[in-house]
Amino acid sequence: MLNFKTLQAIDFQNKTVVLRSDFNVPMINGVISDSERILAGLDTIKFLVKKNCKIVLLSHLSRIKSLEDKLNNKKSLKPVAELLQQLLPTVKVQFSCKNTGAEVKQKVQALAFGEILLLENTRYCDVNDKGEIVKLESKNDPELAKFWASLGEIFVNDAFGTAHRKHASNAGIAKYVAKSCIGFLMEKELKNLSYLIQSPQKPFVVVLGGAKVSDKLKVVENLLKLADNILIGGGMVNTFLKAKGKATANSLVEKELIDVAKQILDKDTHNKIVLAIDQVMGSEFKDQTGITLDVSDKIQEQYQSYMSLDVGSKTIALFESYLKTAKTIFWNGPLGVFEFTNFAKGTSKIGEIIAKNKTAFSVIGGGDSAAAVKQMQLSDQFSFISTGGGASLALIGGEELVGISDIQKNS
């Protein structure tokens, strides 16, 4: 897993470097609301500054679906450049409102060694100036990849969050440069997540939540071979409950995946999969007082229109019985709608239970579970928190990380 070239394997002194980082951070009215991903990528940037490199920085931010998305500047990386300047006060950080063309080339040439130029959101290339959706970045357009590759002598990919996507700014550039490697963050992510699928200390217990089972089917299948137990809650548990013939009322069920869920449960001959046994139900999708019902074959008439929005206290106790003795824990996805106070208990209790187990190597697979743990102020109680939700699931699901597969390997 870690046979990629790393920063230490290449001479960076006075070189021009194209660095793909992951600055896909949440913004509210043009203000960064969580800078975790930017902070996580700083070590690589500082290393390259120390080597007196010219650094051409690339990142995407959100999805660009229309010309309006480009013109209203709500998805511009300018606030990221401003924050980088604050975080690196002794380094000159410039921002280019363009990411292709002669003007960009000139700016790179004019850049002094030890300085940084952040180009505009790579996904701006997904919509052209006529408003047509062309997806040059997202579909790995070779001409775009060649242009970005031409801006430097060495390519460093430190964007773990997009490691499972084959885009022009990651997989594409790696094809057209003479030298490439992974950055410190990518190295750390691969090392910690690889441990889970290569040599986890037993018992290895996995907690899966979140709304959809479709995102996690491969993960469940792959983990059946590796984990001792897979504890399932959140919205995704309903598809499995339905597959077992349980009543799910008006809860989210992915009907087209019921048969697949049934096949997975049939494969689970060692009863590794543990499903929620009670749920907190709400009459509609809003923050309200819920009612706790045991999972059963039938639901009383008056609750037929209710939906599950959290796991109940019996499920929390059941999950705790597995988690307190675990030596390795992987958690991806909240166990309820933790944004609603009345349905946050399952997620917060499971977070506390994992944090309390000081002998376990505990990993959070990015995304909403990382946000939940941050909200609970428990982030420092976990061994590792991944910056990539989808990428961590892809890796643990046994998929090839296509965004980094063309990075140079150690010979």
UniProtKB/Swiss-Prot annotation:
Record's keyword terms, sorted: ATP-binding, Cytoplasm, Glycolysis, Kinase, Nucleotide-binding, Transferase
Sections of the chain in a coiled coil: none
Domain of life: Bacteria
Reaction catalysis annotation: (2R)-3-phosphoglycerate + ATP = (2R)-3-phospho-glyceroyl phosphate + ADP
Binding positions for ATP per the UniProt entry: K216, E339, G366, G367, D368, S369
Binding sites annotated in the UniProt record for substrate: D22, F23, N24, R37, H60, L61, S62, R63, R123, R165
Record pathway: Carbohydrate degradation; glycolysis; pyruvate from D-glyceraldehyde 3-phosphate: step 2/5
GO terms for cellular component: cytosol
GO molecular function, one term: phosphoglycerate kinase activity
Keyword Repeat in annotation: no
EC number of this enzyme: 2.7.2.3
BP GO terms, sorted: gluconeogenesis; glycolytic process
Effects seen without this gene: Probably essential, it was not disrupted in a global transposon mutagenesis study.
Subcellular location, principal: cytoplasm
Compartment(s) where it occurs, according to its Swiss-Prot or TrEMBL record: Cytoplasm
Family from the record: Belongs to the phosphoglycerate kinase family.
Subunit structure, as described in the record: Monomer.
PANTHER family, A to Z: PHOSPHOGLYCERATE KINASE (PTHR11406), PHOSPHOGLYCERATE KINASE 1, CHLOROPLASTIC-RELATED (PTHR11406:SF23)
UniProt xrefs under HAMAP family: Phosphoglyc_kinase
Protein name: Phosphoglycerate kinase
Originating species: Mycoplasma genitalium (strain ATCC 33530 / DSM 19775 / NCTC 10195 / G37)
Lineage start: Bacteria, Bacillati, Mycoplasmatota, Mycoplasmoidales, Mycoplasmoidaceae
Gene behind the chain: pgk
